[in-house]
C-alpha cells in the first residue's frame, strides 16, 4: 500500500502540473500561439464544439493566427465564438478564413498578465499541497492500522515531501519561464 500511496501522490502532483501548463499555454504573451484557442467552444449545429476540431489553425506571421474552417458555413459561428471568448482579440473574417492579430502588449498589460501567472502558480501549488496532505494522512492511517512501522512511515513521508518539493520547484520554473516570455515579448 505504501508504494501505492507514493505513486498516487506523484501521479496527482503531475496532473496538477499538467493543468497548470495548459493554463499557462492559454495566456497571451504578445506572440501568436495556437494554444490560445484551445478552450474556445463554437456553437455548431446546436452543439458546443471545440474550435480546434472544426478548423485548422496556422501561424503565418509571428503575431497572426489564421483559422481555416473545414466547413465554410461555420465561419460566422466561429467568429461569434471568438468574440464571446473574452480573449480580447477581434477576428477579421474575409469570407474564407479568420485572422486574429495579436496586439503588442503594453507595459501595464504585461504586469497584469505576470500577476495572473503568479496567481495560477499559487493555485497549482495549493493543489500539490493538498495531494501531499492526502498522502501524509494515508501514511498515518497505514501506520495506525499496523500495515507499516513508524520508521517506514517517516521514510515514506520524506519521499512524499521530496516529490512535493520537486513539484513546487517545477511550478516555479514554469512560472518564471512564462513571466520571462511575457516581459520580453
Swiss-Prot record:
Gene3D superfamilies: 3.30.1360.40, Ribosome-recycling factor (1.10.132.20). Pfam families: RRF. SUPFAM superfamilies: Ribosome recycling factor, RRF (SSF55194). GO terms for biological process: translational termination. Keywords: Cytoplasm, Protein biosynthesis. It is found in: Cytoplasm. It comes from the Bacteria. Residues 140-168 are annotated as: Disordered. NCBIfam families: frr (TIGR00496). This is Ribosome-recycling factor. The lineage of its organism: Bacteria, Bacillati, Bacillota, Bacilli, Lactobacillales.
Amino acid at each position: 500500500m505504501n508504494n501505492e500511496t507514493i505513486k498516487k501522490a506523484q501521479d496527482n502532483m503531475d496532473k496538477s502540473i499538467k493543468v497548470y501548463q495548459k493554463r499557462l499555454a492559454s495566456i497571451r504573451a504578445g506572440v501568436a500561439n495556437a494554444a490560445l484557442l484551445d478552450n474556445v467552444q463554437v456553437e455548431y449545429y446546436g452543439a458546443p464544439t471545440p474550435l480546434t476540431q472544426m478548423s485548422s489553425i496556422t501561424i503565418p506571421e509571428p503575431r497572426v493566427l489564421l483559422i481555416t474552417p473545414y466547413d465554410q458555413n461555420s465561419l460566422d459561428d466561429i467568429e461569434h465564438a471568438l468574440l464571446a471568448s473574452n480573449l480580447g482579440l477581434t477576428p477579421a473574417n474575409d469570407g474564407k478564413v479568420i485572422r486574429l492579430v495579436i496586439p503588442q502588449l503594453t507595459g501595464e498589460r504585461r504586469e497584469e498578465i505576470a500577476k495572473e501567472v503568479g496567481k495560477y502558480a499559487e493555485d497549482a501549488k495549493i493543489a500539490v499541497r493538498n495531494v501531499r496532505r492526502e498522502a501524509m494522512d494515508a501514511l498515518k492511517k497505514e501506520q495506525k492500522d499496523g500495515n507499516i512501522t513508524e520508521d517506514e512511515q517517516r521514510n515514506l513521508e520524506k519521499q512524499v515531501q521530496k516529490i512535493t518539493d520537486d513539484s513546487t520547484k517545477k511550478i516555479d520554473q514554469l512560472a518564471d519561464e512564462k513571466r520571462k516570455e511575457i516581459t520580453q515579448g
